[in-house]
Swiss-Prot record:
It catalyses: 3-phosphoshikimate + phosphoenolpyruvate = 5-O-(1-carboxyvinyl)-3-phosphoshikimate + phosphate. The gene is aroA. GO terms for biological process: amino acid biosynthetic process; aromatic amino acid family biosynthetic process; chorismate biosynthetic process. This is 3-phosphoshikimate 1-carboxyvinyltransferase. One of its GO terms (cellular component) is cytoplasm.
Amino acid sequence: MESLTLQPIARVDGTINLPGSKSVSNRALLLAALAHGKTVLTNLLDSDDVRYMLNALKALGVSYTLSADRTRCEIIGNGGPLHAKSALELFLGNAGTAMRPLAAALCLGSNDIVLTGEPRMKERPIGHLVDALRLGGAKITYLEQENYPPLRLQGGFTGGNVDVDGSVSSQFLTALLMTAPLAPEDTVIRIKGDLVSKPYIDITLNLMKTFGVEIENQHYQQFVVKGGQSYQSPGTYLVEGDASSASYFLAAAAIKGGTVKVTGIGRNSMQGDIRFADVLEKMGATICWGDDYISCTRGELNAIDMDMNHIPDAAMTIATAALFAKGNTTLRNIYNWRVKETDRLFAMATELRKVGAEVEEGHDFIRITPPEKLKFAEIATYNDHRMAMCFSLVALSDTAVTILDPKCTAKTFPDYFEQLARISQAA
């Protein structure tokens, strides 16, 4: 297996121009494909997950052109639901941001489409979404294991009253919200359980509004969506920088700054993960906000005990930053780490122990006590981009770290390690 050894880093300082947000990129691509008119997306993320969405749209007959660097995309909207001319199988890798929204959108009208993916995708639950779509009339068949992909979709979603469990993944609700306006009837979506990752729902609602569709949000407990609507192209749309990707550079600055400035997000960003900067500030770093940047300057870091449900992806970065904080850090209400690219609670606990931390792994929490001195380790990444990027922070100690399968960052940030090296000074 390929590996990358990072030598100790004495200091980080500089500016990072963030790649486009994965969450925003894939939502915007699908809405542009469903919309009337031509949409030009700029600062689109070029990564594996986005390529899976683009390939799926092409197979569904959507016409688009990409710039040479794949960050500008002109899409000719379909002006309504997407249909395959004949039976079709779409391979979506391990891209939840493609699998979940497409599973819903392709239930409009009549289709015969199979959605499948990598082995890990077949372990990521989708039953709550399927149950909700079936309540709205969709015909969906599990081809292997009940409640998991691959799925056969044969259309039929017309709207009506649907319940969806919000406690596992906000992507199920996102998928329903994006699909419901194009259904022939009105849809009332009721949330069962506690809704996780609410800020990701705000991204969805924000984008739907940009594409001309309004819905009624009743305190995140019920959503009322008028049927028979259509999406309209906003013309040109700039994809925000990826706030989850910003977390590694901001944390690096908190540990070994200097000052690091990330551009492409700022105080008015729609992504909930910008709140990661508030957590660093609470730990002792100095944060400065602009309209299109966030900067972080080193501070004496202290442990925290916090509910991290609102920033599940960026919270992983706090788990490795905790290695450099004084005291025991506890991250709570993070059960949904277990159904991501890997079981992130298990993976994080396992790899933190390798570098010498004392770790308690609970059902939905993790408690981390840093060692006096970090140990050299080979870090398994579990084909999870965030594990690779999180553990790069270990090099901010006086210990090297080896990251196995470093190219797994291609899911969201193909040149992450080059960007980190650019702002790093060797010890």
